[in-house]
UniProtKB/Swiss-Prot annotation:
Pathway: Polyketide biosynthesis
Protein family membership: Belongs to the FAD-binding monooxygenase family.
The UniProt record lists the keyword Lyase: no
The protein, known as: FAD-dependent monooxygenase DEP4
Organism: Fusarium langsethiae
Pfam family, one: Pyr_redox_3
SUPFAM superfamilies: FAD/NAD(P)-binding domain (SSF51905)
CC cofactor: FAD
Keyword check for NADP: yes
Source organism superkingdom: Eukaryota
Enzyme Commission number(s): 1.-.-.-
The protein's role, per its UniProt record: Part of the gene cluster that mediates the biosynthesis of depudecin, a highly oxidized eleven-carbon linear polyketide that acts as a histone deacetylase (HDAC) inhibitor and makes a small contribution to pathogenesis. The reducing polyketide synthase DEP5 is the central enzyme in depudecin biosynthesis by yielding the backbone polyketide chain. The monooxygenases DEP2 and DEP4, as well as the uncharacterized protein DEP1, then act as tailoring enzymes to modify the intermediate polyketide chain into depudecin.
Induction: Expression correlates with the production of depudecin with high levels on oat grain medium, and minimal levels on oat flower medium and complete medium.
């Protein structure tokens, strides 16, 4: 006879920003919950865990913007431009877990190999590598967007050097310092820029191999806007947000002016051309043929579309280090590796190397779900419902074109369809990027997907997603009809495809649009999204997490009011029945 499963009310998979906050929020709102947090790392933090960080790794967000609203981050190891180091972030998340009692609920070095439905359809069974399965009534799948590294496979004959992913760069610091003189870096994501900078600072020779796809290289902002203030501070203002055409912000004066009027669209175009010019001027791509290969596409406004990705040069001397460093860019792909230390390229060249570092990004971390369950959960496009979703997508395209004419004729040639197909065929079809419409419409509140978005302002997004999601899982809020939820998901996906081109075809991507997303979740919760004390601050002063530090108490107040109204209604009905 098989032993009974170890069962929990809630299991959270992932101990990064999203998983820790989801667990804390659940325990705050339902303190008696039997909750477990699982993570396959040796320490908390996810991509910011102790084993994954290295000295030159910094977040792309300035210090006061990269923290939970109610738990200030120490001002330690901050870059000259105000960016937070990986070491500081890891210590912060570890302290957060300890101070909020989450360590007692945590199991590290625990890999979930398979997730499936139990005999009871609202129960989830988790198969654990090298251990007994676990069961739970509610599952919070908070593995995030950076948990499943993409590692290409090539023909290999006699190659003996390490081949690692950028995720493992922290573990290989001693090896690189003592054994590496020449390195091959593969990819054009932000992590490739970080890896190249780190290697050049260590005096290594770098061969940077990046496929010459249509989406082009990563768009890298200067650390400051016009040399006056931190770029992350600038894009966290409502004023800057108004220049980005966004499906989550389609009303109000700024929308009607900047996105609907001819003059407003001219000013919007001028804003983005200026931003692109400042970015290009800071990078000085024209200095060499080598650096010209890193110029974002389209050349005139690459930082607006961000088809290859969008980020910030967090090291003040990044471009000077690059221009002076011993680095060669190869616009091709690796064909094979051989002869102990040789990397063979498709353009016919061969390169000797002491290590290969993949900076090839991340696939969607849904390998634990079988294909049928992935379709049921909206994690992949269901071919059975292809015609229905095609109609929804076509209507969504029309909606986006009507509401946001600035991106109506987006340059679709800047994309790599092969890359899109390899990453789950596009963004999830989830309502508010969190909930499966089909399950929610059936009253199934047993699974939530926080963190599967690409937004630079991670801590605040984690906090709002947690409060929104946990309150729904507890049955405290109802959602719209299935049709409305599916339309919302289709509209968002159509928008992000048009707005961010290749990135939007692969991910729920909204780097410039975090304020409208936060506003949307706040309104859903019945909370006031406008947090500043006056109109000037509301539009021109940066929004930071501490502006939201009272949202949990605010939501509790809303919840108390709702319960009082429910009781009042029940008493009225009871009185009417007595009168009858």
């Amino acid at each position: 006879m098989s032993q009974p499963l170890e069962t929990f009310d809630v299991i959270v998979i992932g101990a990064g920003w999203y998983g820790l906050m989801a667990a804390r929020t659940f325990l705050e709102l339902a303190p008696d919950t039997n909750l477990l947090i699982l993570d396959d790392g040796k320490t908390v933090g996810g991509v910011w865990s102790k084993e994954r960080i290295y000295p030159s790794l910094f977040a792309q967000i300035s210090h006061p913007l990269f923290e939970y609203s109610f738990y200030p981050m120490p001002e330690e190891d901050i870059s000259p431009d105000g960016f937070v180091s990986g070491k500081t972030i890891q210590k912060y998340l570890e302290a957060f877990a300890k101070d909020h009692g989450l360590i007692l609920h945590l199991r590290l070095e625990t890999r979930v190999e398979k997730v499936k439905r139990g005999v009871n359809s609202n129960e989830w069974i988790l198969e654990i590598k090298g251990d007994k399965p676990l069961a739970c009534s509610k599952l919070i799948y908070a593995t995030g967007a950076n948990s499943s590294p993409i590692i290409p496979k090539w023909p290999r004959e006699g190659f003996e050097k390490p081949v690692i992913h950028s995720l493992d760069l922290g573990r290989y610091q001693d090896y690189i310092a003592n054994n590496v003189q020449k390195a091959v870096v593969v990819g054009r994501s932000k992590s490739s820029y970080d890896a190249v900078y780190h290697l050049l600072c260590a005096g290594k020779k770098v061969n940077w191999v990046m496929r010459d796809g249509q989406s082009g290289p990563f768009s890298l902002y200067a650390p400051t806007f016009m040399g006056l203030w931190n770029i992350a501070d600038h894009i966290s203002t409502r004023f800057a947000s108004s220049f980005s055409p966004c499906i989550m912000s389609t009303d109000g004066f700024c929308y009607n002016f900047f996105q609907r009027s001819a003059l407003g669209r001219v000013l919007t175009n001028m804003y983005w051309r200026t931003a692109n010019y400042l970015s290009v001027s800071h990078a000085e791509y024209w200095r060499t043929e080598n650096s010209e290969k890193l110029r974002p596409r389209p050349y005139s406004d690459g930082v607006f579309w961000g088809s290859g990705g969008i980020g910030i040069a967090t090291a003040p001397d990044f471009w000077e280090t690059f221009h002076r460093g011993d680095v060669t860019i190869h616009s091709t792909e690796i064909e094979s590796v051989s002869h102990k230390d040789v990397t063979n390229l498709k353009n016919g060249y061969s390169i000797a190397t002491d290590i290969i570092i993949h900076c090839t990004g991340f696939d969607k971390g849904y390998g634990a779900f079988d294909p049928q369950l992935r379709n049921e959960l909206g994690l992949e496009y269901n071919t059975k419902e292809f015609s229905r979703w095609t109609m929804l997508d076509e209507k969504a395209d029309q909606t986006v074109d009507r509401l946001l004419p600035y991106i109506c004729d987006s340059p679709n040639q800047y994309g790599d369809s092969e890359a899109s197909r390899s990453t789950g065929q596009g963004p999830n079809r989830h309502y508010r990027r969190l909930v499966v419409p089909e399950l929610a419409a059936r009253g199934d509140r047993s699974i939530l997907f926080p963190g599967h978005i690409h937004s630079a302002f991670t801590p605040l997004a984690a906090e709002l997603q947690a409060l929104w999601g946990v309150s729904w899982m507890l049955g405290w809020r109802d959602l719209p009809s299935k049709e409305e939820m599916e339309t919302e998901a289709a509209n968002f996906n159509a928008w992000t495809r048009k707005r961010y081109l290749e990135q939007g075809r692969k991910h729920s991507y909204f780097i410039y649009d975090y304020i409208p997303y936060i506003d949307t979740l706040m309104k859903d919760l019945g909370l006031d999204p406008f947090r500043k004390s006056n109109v000037f601050e509301e539009w021109f002063v940066r929004y930071k997490p501490s502006d939201y530090k009272t949202i949990l108490e605010e939501y509790r107040s809303v919840r108390r009011h709702e319960r009082e109204m429910e009781r009042s209604g029940e008493e009225s009905v009871a009185r009417m029945k007595r009168c009858d």
